[in-house]
Regions:
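Conserved HGGG/HGGXW glycine-rich cap/lid loop of the alpha/beta-hydrolase fold
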Residues: 49-100
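Conserved hydrolase catalytic core segment
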Residues: 87, 129-173
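Alpha/beta-hydrolase fold catalytic core
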Residues: 1-64, 86-88, 125-129
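Active-site loop/oxyanion-hole signature of alpha/beta-hydrolase fold enzymes
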Residues: 46-49, 54, 92-135
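Conserved serine/cysteine hydrolase catalytic core
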Residues: 226-280
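The conserved beta1-alpha1 loop
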Residues: 65-69, 137, 269
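A catalytic-pocket lid/entrance helix-loop region that shapes and gates access to the active site
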Residues: 161-194
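Conserved alpha/beta-hydrolase catalytic His-Asp/Glu region
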Residues: 188-248
Length: 280
């Protein structure tokens, strides 16, 4: 790895194997292998908030920037990015209010776009003659689409993974979607659980589905939590539930934006996904 440190905060080159400590009891060989690939970890400042990122690979290669889903974190890609790093310069980061990044008073989509642009610039993704490709999962797709819609010249394209794309009429018919991010009012406090086991019991997949890969479930659960106040609680900022995207019912506009954004686009979705149907 060719080390890069454009930002003021020091960065460290490490492997992610320590991410398995206390997270996965008996990790498979492939998971250990993927996390043994060296990566850079650091922080950059975006509008007064520290943004946590990981970087893999050689910065002389074309770039990929990876955007995680709502209430998730960059470690969603920790076991995927190392394989891409053989051919690409890969960066994944935590949105503010999630993972190990700092919190904000509010989370408008405009600040999400600013974070994306700043991370791409400060980690060197923009230095290559080929502009980076956005790989965006779920909520990250809204951020990626907004960024590429406003700054198409700064990206080579976008790959959208399991972003909810439904007709407005179908959206309205599904009452369970009223609990989507931004649809709730008020700022609640995250509960503090007495121990990790109690906290982990509250970790679920969304949408609800069977756990097919228990080690990845355990990995994601552990890194979604933190020790605090003598117990364990979620890393995410509860203020996220008032994000601008939900308050203006932005999900209703997603299908049109996917069509109208002028850029190279690809969509990947789960065969049995409830967020992307045959009608989509």
């Amino acid at each position: 790895m060719k080390k890069m440190n454009k930002n003021a905060d020091p960065t460290v080159v490490i492997t992610g194997v320590t991410d398995l400590d206390h997270a996965v009891v008996s990790p498979s060989s492939w998971l250990q292998e993927s996390l043994s690939v060296p990566r850079e970890e650091g922080y950059i400042d975006v509008d007064g908030t520290r943004i946590h990122y990981f970087r893999w690979g050689d910065n002389t290669k074309p770039g990929i920037i990876m955007l995680h889903g709502f209430l998730a974190h960059a470690r969603c890609f920790a076991f995927i990015a190392p394989y891409l790093a053989a051919d690409y310069h890969v960066v994944a980061y935590d949105f503010s209010g999630m993972g190990d990044s700092g919190a904000r008073e509010t989370y408008p989509l405009a600040i999400r776009v600013e974070e994306l642009l700043s991370v791409a610039e400060q980690t060197g993704l923009n230095d290559h003659e080929q502009k980076p490709i956005i790989v965006a999962h779920s909520y990250g797709g809204h951020v990626g689409l907004a960024a590429i819609d406003e700054h198409a010249e700064q990206f080579s394209g976008i790959i959208i993974c399991d972003l909810m794309i439904l007709r407005p009429s179908v959206f309205e018919e599904k009452p369970e979607l009223s609990k989507l991010p931004g649809q709730q009012a008020g700022k609640r406090q995250n509960r503090i659980y007495p121990n990790y086991a109690a906290a982990k019991q509250r970790f679920v997949l969304s949408p609800p589905q069977a756990v097919e890969q228990s080690e990845l479930f355990d990995f994601m659960a552990f890194h979604s939590l933190k020790e605090i106040g003598g117990g364990w609680s979620w890393k995410f900022d509860p203020g996220l539930f008032n994000i601008e995207l939900g308050s203006d019912r932005g999900y209703l506009h997603t299908p049109r934006k996917v069509i109208t954004v002028e850029s190279r686009k690809a969509i990947i979705y789960g065969q049995e996904s409830t967020l992307f149907t045959d009608d989509s």
